[in-house]
């Protein structure tokens, strides 16, 4: 199924869900890819960047990632998933979402996956973010 592409329907049906836990961002060298495969239960995302592999992971892997990366681990973040199945070609959903969060002074890191869009917001602002999204 291709998912919803109409912006009004997407906004009406997005039903943001606050996921349990704290999440972090880090980067590791590409040579660590096989090592990462042993920790997939706590990894939400791996993205290849020119500087290395950008990793989003749960708090349970914080110590492991600290050993694998020589760089700063960023977080904690809360994860809000938009439960509507959005079409990857849909126009405007993330623009609306990030705009309403920006107006509340809430930073957001968004990841669009195959079925849903996912928002990482500062953990201490998670309830504020949910309230802002409810305005849409």
Model-derived regions, located:
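Regulatory modules associated with amino-acid/nitrogen control
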Residues: 1-83, 87-96, 134
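Short amphipathic alpha-helical patches
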Residues: 34, 38, 121-128
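Structural preference for solvent-exposed beta-strand-turn elements
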Residues: 63, 110-116, 120-125, 134-135
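Short, compact, well-ordered microdomains
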Residues: 85-114, 118-120
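Predominant activation on well-ordered alpha-helical scaffold segments within soluble catalytic domains
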Residues: 95, 127-130
